[in-house]
């Protein structure tokens, strides 16, 4: 990689690490050849997530995702333009990825622009599987995880996203990050979510409990999921459990309590050790 290419790649990696700071610690427990691959894939997913969830203008988002579709299609055929795809497709492991999954990845990102309200948590997770199922399949191929665990790994990704999206609940986003049955159970309305009242606190606490249960089950079912995914899920679970015991659980989720660096080091070491034994 030339200095120019390295600088371009590093700028995307920095954006990914800013959003996923635990991955800098996780990288210490990866084999040297897997570190760059992890950064390239993580940065690619981050770019697509930003287009799918972070851009307000639909046309701009769709153009960006379609550009990535063409880039990944060309990269799979040996022609690359973007520094992320240049690094990723230079890795021999990438040849193990089914070419159709690159297209499914972009289709899933486009589908996220049209996610609506879901009746219950399973339906909500199902909506996000359009993106995170291909993400998990690709990650599984890149890091030699059992393909049978890809479905469960996709749930780890989806729950992580829903926890992140919950931080914007008070803004009453168009893509509601909680299911409708939760609103009915707590006798509240979508617009009332903007108010820091006891009903909202109980709703968020209830939702965190359901997400935590889903995450615990998924972690138990996918003991050989990629290290990066399991560590992130462990940290998410700790945050959910701590926030659920707070007087204002939404505020606790937004604040992301300190000490995460040591928690990351602990879980990275523990999960890497467990992976080595399986």
Please place each PLM-identified region on the residue numbering.
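Catalytic cores of Mg2+-dependent Asp-rich isoprenoid enzymes
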Residues: 1-89, 105, 128-137, 150-159, ...
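Hydrophobic alpha-helical segments and helix pairs
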Residues: 90-138
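Catalytic palm subdomain of template-directed nucleic-acid polymerases
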Residues: 140-143
């Amino acid at each position: 990689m030339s200095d120019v290419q390295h600088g371009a790649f590093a700028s995307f990696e920095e954006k990914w690490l800013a959003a996923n700071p635990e991955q800098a610690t996780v990288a210490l427990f990866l084999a040297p050849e897997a570190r760059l691959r992890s950064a390239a894939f993580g940065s690619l997913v981050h770019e697509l997530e930003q287009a799918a969830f972070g851009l307000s203008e639909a046309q701009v988002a769709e153009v960006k995702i379609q550009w990535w579709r063409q880039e990944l299609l060309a990269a799979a055929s040996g022609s690359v333009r973007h520094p992320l795809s240049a690094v990723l497709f230079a890795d021999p492991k990438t040849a193990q990825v089914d070419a159709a999954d690159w297209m499914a990845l972009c289709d899933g990102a486009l589908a996220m622009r049209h996610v609506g309200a879901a009746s219950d948590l399973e339906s909500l997770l199902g909506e996000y599987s359009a993106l995170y199922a291909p993400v998990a399949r690709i990650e599984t191929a890149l890091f030699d995880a059992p393909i049978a665990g890809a479905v469960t790994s996709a749930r780890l990704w989806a729950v992580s996203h829903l926890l992140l999206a919950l931080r914007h609940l008070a803004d009453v986003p168009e893509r509601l990050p909680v299911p409708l049955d939760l609103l009915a159970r707590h006798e509240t309305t979508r617009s009332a979510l903007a108010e820091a009242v006891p009903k909202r606190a109980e709703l968020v606490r209830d939702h965190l409990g359901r997400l935590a249960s889903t995450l615990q089950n998924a972690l138990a079912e996918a003991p050989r999921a990629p290290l990066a995914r399991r560590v992130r899920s462990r940290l998410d679970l700790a945050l959910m459990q701590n926030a659920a015991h707070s007087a204002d659980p939404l505020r606790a989720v937004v604040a992301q309590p300190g000490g995460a660096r040591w928690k990351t080091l602990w879980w990275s070491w523990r999960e890497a050790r467990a992976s080595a034994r399986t």
